[in-house]
């Protein structure tokens, strides 16, 4: 499983790495709900330190949480005050992490301003607060834990220099937004945000399982990987491939086969494209059985597994493989890509068959 470069990957899609592009179909003046993400300039850990026991339920003593610095408290305060400056916008739940934050914004009615203008004003307020805190760094001992020598040097430089078009003061230029569409999505967002501190602690405990490896040689192919690479060495790996036309009876037979295989320690591999394949993968997740999943898109710069993938990855039960580089505008998988993913799954299964 040697790591190699993927520049000549025959499956490669055009590079399109930006996570900060706006949705072309969305009017950012309209009534809408968003989850906003902003990252500190240089990924500096300015907002606090995540502490606690990842095995303790959220909300109980010593459960995972972030202990905010004064800088983190200032950003949280600015977020809460967005409504004071733009009455059409309500600031919802915010989860600060050491070097970024996620926050929910509700545009309650159509507004003249673009959402980007509202967030630009928020950043200006944060920058003012950051400058004020900067003058106190020399006398506040509790900043010693949160701000390293590189920060002090970078801050001094930033405070005495005009910002260029590529860099910000406190935050990176731009922001990422996700638009709420379906019923129940808001609750899922809030649960995800509250779970962020626990997820970070789990990643710290299992760093190798959450690191993207580029150009891994898998059955003669170069793939990017995240998760437990040792699953590729299991003696039995079975491909999950179910036709879209499969009957309920046929699906039940497939489930029975993969359930028995999982009970004897077999690994399943699949891109999980059809409804039947998804149903079998869900069954295997519930059984806490090992699974190799082929992704329809590649890994971004800060890729991490989400949802059910996260805990499966932490437990060493999951390996994610991607034959293509990340494409931020990836929308719908093509028939050719489906065929390629199933062929890759077939080769992985045959390799261990």
Describe the role of every protein-language-model region:
Residues 1-216:
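Short catalytic/metal-binding and nucleic-acid-binding patches
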Residues 212-353:
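Glycine-biased, small-residue-rich flexible motifs in mid-sequence functional cores and linkers
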């Amino acid at each position: 499983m040697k790591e190699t470069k993927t520049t000549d990957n025959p499956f490669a899609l055009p590079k399109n790495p930006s996570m900060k592009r706006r949705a072309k179909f969305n009017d950012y003046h309209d009534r809408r709900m968003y989850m906003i993400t902003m990252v500190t300039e240089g990924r500096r850990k300015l907002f606090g330190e995540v502490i606690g026991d990842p095995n303790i339920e959220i909300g109980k003593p010593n459960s995972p949480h972030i202990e905010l610095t004064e800088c983190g408290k200032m950003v949280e305060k600015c977020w809460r005050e967005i409504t004071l400056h733009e009455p059409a916008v309500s600031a919802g739940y915010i989860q600060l992490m050491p070097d970024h934050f996620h926050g929910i914004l509700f545009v309650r009615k159509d507004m003249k301003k673009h959402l980007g203008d509202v967030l630009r004003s928020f950043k200006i307020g944060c920058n003012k607060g950051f400058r004020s805190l900067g003058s106190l760094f020399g006398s506040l001992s509790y900043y010693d834990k949160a701000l390293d020598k590189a920060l002090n040097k970078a801050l001094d430089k930033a405070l005495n220099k005009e910002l260029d078009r590529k860099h910000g003061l406190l935050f990176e230029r731009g922001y990422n937004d996700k638009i709420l569409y379906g019923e129940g999505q808001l609750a899922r967002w809030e649960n995800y945000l509250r779970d962020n501190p626990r997820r970070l602690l789990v990643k710290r405990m299992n760093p190798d399982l959450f690191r993207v490896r580029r150009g891994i040689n898998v059955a003669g192919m170069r793939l990017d990987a995240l998760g437990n690479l040792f699953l590729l060495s299991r003696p039995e790996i079975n491909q999950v491939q179910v036709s879209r036309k499969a009957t309920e009876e046929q699906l039940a037979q497939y489930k029975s086969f993969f359930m028995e295989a999982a009970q004897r320690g077999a690994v399943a591999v699949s891109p999980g494209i059809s409804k039947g394949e998804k149903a079998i993968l869900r069954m295997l997740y519930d059984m806490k059985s090992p699974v190799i999943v082929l992704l329809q898109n590649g890994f971004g710069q800060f890729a991490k597994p989400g949802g059910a993938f996260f805990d499966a990855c932490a437990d060493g039960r999951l390996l994610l493989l991607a034959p293509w580089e990340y494409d931020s505008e990836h929308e719908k998988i093509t028939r050719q890509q489906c065929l390629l993913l199933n062929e890759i799954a077939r080769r992985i299964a045959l390799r261990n068959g």
